[in-house]
Amino acid sequence: EINYLNDLANKLGRKLTDSEVFGFSQVNSEHCRHKIFNGTFIIDGEEKPSSLFSMIKETSKQNPNDIVSAYKDNVAFIRGPKVEQFAPTRADIPSYYQTEEFQSVISLKAETHNFPTTVEPFNGAATGSGGEIRDRLAGGKGSLPLAGTAVYMTSYSRLGNNRSWEQKMKERPWLYQTPVDILIKASNGASDFGNKFGQPLITGSLFTFEHEEDSRKLGFD
């Protein structure tokens, strides 16, 4: 990538600006282009036939069931039930309301915001909810956010002394936030952003895990 930018600067006959370099770093990031996730893997000298991304896509390709759209936008759609909608006959002029039956399509979206939530739990989780809402609003011809869920996975929270399994390992020094701070602030942030858009956070899951064996420490971080 550095060689590419140097060649580009030579072609333009000038140094690239900070804005151009930072812009390139965003649009050419793994987050946007999946250069690793969708890249070619060569293991022990043998090129693998499928990328990690194509292997995940294969599930819906082999068993589409009620999938309407997947991996073509920033959100997936599945076929929903037939529903009645009470709405104006026309949207461009004053008109009577009517009840009309139509085939609904349900949007599904998962947004991971692990590192931002680790650094700043409230706003990290809030913008995670925001990204999920944004992508569903912009998917296809647009969809309406109705409800959200959240999953939190951290090391042991150590809320009290009555959980013997949490006391078997010494608590590590945390680089950014403690697990209990993440659980409390992230939950507040995800709910707060959803409420501002009329999307309540209605359910979710919470997992905590730590394990030490042969001087090796494992856990949700």
Residue positions per predicted region:
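Core nucleic-acid recognition elements
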Residues: E1-D221
